[in-house]
UniProtKB/Swiss-Prot annotation:
Gene behind the chain: yvrP
InterPro entries registered for this protein in UniProt: CusB_D23, UPF0194_transport
Coiled-coil regions, chain positions: 106-183
Transmembrane segments: 8-28
Protein name: Putative efflux system protein YvrP
Record keywords, A-Z: Cell membrane, Coiled coil, Membrane, Transmembrane, Transmembrane helix
Source organism per UniProt: Bacillus subtilis (strain 168)
Amino acid sequence: MSKKKKWLIGGAICAGVLVLAGIGAGGFYFFTHMNQVAVSSEPYAESVAVYMGGDSESGQTFSGKVEPEKQQKVYIDSEKGSIKKTYVKEGDQVKKGDKLFEYEGEDHSDEVEQANLQIEMTNLQINRLQKSITETEKKLKVAGKEEKNQLQDELDQTNFDLKTSQLELKQHQKELAGLTKNKGSNVITSKHDGIVQSVNQDIADGATGDQAAGPYIQIVSTGKYLVKSQINELLMDTIKKGSKVRVTLKTGGEGEWKGKVTSIGKLPAGAGEGEESESFADEEMNPQSSNYPFTILLDSHKGLEVGYHVNIEVMSDNADADTIKLPSDMVIQDDGEPYVWKADENHKAVKQPVEIGETDENDMVEIKSGLTPEDYVIYPDPAVKEGKQVTVNADTE
């Protein structure tokens, strides 16, 4: 039954004429409200909210896993030596730049001293060669023809030696910089704010095999949460970037969270370099087609924890979700000024001026201003008068 017919039935009821408009959903609506108004001549008021769009499910559901927006996995570099000290434990809150742990590191003091000596000696050599070049150039200006040839050969050799020494200097400086950098990199710090999710002490203690697999420390951000999932290529047209979703726990419960799709992978799951492909066992995966990862950013995550497995319901797009539309015959024109009847706080009929927009193919007219979703509107049958007591739909009040 259309919204317009619903109002016609309501008006007929209020006039005391009981008309059976149909069966099924229409008959159910009629008998549900008949007892409320059949004994009264009061007009009937319905909530404006029922004439708004809102979310509805598209029928597509997926499985996913809650993940932090940012996470840092720190692996041990065996070339830097053993762990000297760990500064954090599981559950600690850290800020960007905080120390996580420190390597014992190798003692490079002898190498640093040797590099500094080589740099100093090379600089002395460069200075000597530059002075020799200056003196030779002066002699060339006053030398005879035979002497000039000899001095030119000396000058060419000295210039060659100078360039060689300058290259040696750059090499020694590079070696020193490398030694200094390695010394500073012994301390590993956090890349962002977050919580230490785990510290694998077995790795620090020198464990091997399966116990040594994985990161030494994992940090998860405390900001926004994501949901990671996959979609089969045959269903790619059912979601897009910006699609709204509803998330619920697989374990059940009343909690639900809203979010939207922020990215859809251009490569199949697991095809990216270093990318792990997670299997969603309860999804119907077509072996003859590929699955693509997509990510959801949640509006809030209170009650969710990283690692939770969830259900994802894609909401259908609805451009009229926040638009109020009423049956066109509910809008009355008074000398070109449109108005509707609505119930005031005392459940009495009052005229409400409105600004109207276009009328759609279903004969529903857009109400641009004058009404809110909290208002209750009345079908304009002959019984409606200014100040008339009305019956408000208790189901939507």
